Amino acid sequence: MKAHRVLVSQPRPAVVEKSPFYELSQKHKAEIEYMPFIRVVGVSLKEFRSQRVEILAHTAVIFTSRTTVDSFFHICEEARITVPETMKYICQTEAVALYLQKYIVYRKRKISFADGSFTNFIELIIKHKEEKFMLALSEPHKPELPETLAKLKLQLSLIHISEPTRPI
C-alpha cells in the first residue's frame, strides 16, 4: 500500500521548494497538504484588562515563547501603551530573545536569556530578584514556572495573553 497524499500539521512554508517535505513528495510522487491543527491567538484587550494587571508598574517581563512576545506587544499596541526603554526582558531561550528585535532595540543590558534549561532560567531570574516581574503565559501552560517563582517570593504578576484555537 502506497500513500498518495500526506497531511503535514504545519502551516504552508513561504517557499515550498525549500521545505524538506518537497523532496519527499518529488521522490515518492505524493501530494503534500499543509494544515495546522492548532493556532495560537492572543487574548482580546477586554480579556486582558479583566486580569487587572498594570504593565507600566512592572520593571521586567518574563517570556517563555515567541507567541507570548507577539501577544504582549500586540496588547500594548492595542491599549496604546508605550513600553519604556528601561523595561528589562528575561527570555527562556536565545531564540526568543533574538525574536524581541522585531519589537524593541536589542541591548544586552536589558535582555537576558537562559540556555533553555529550567534550572538555568530560574537562576537567571534570581539574579534580577529586585525587579518587579510580569510573567507572560499562554493557556494552557506548565505550572512549574509560576509555582517555583511563587516559592521564591518574588514580586510577580501572572498574565495570560494567548490561547490555542482550532483553525476552521
Give the label of every model feature segment:
Residues 1-162, 166:
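Conserved beta-alpha
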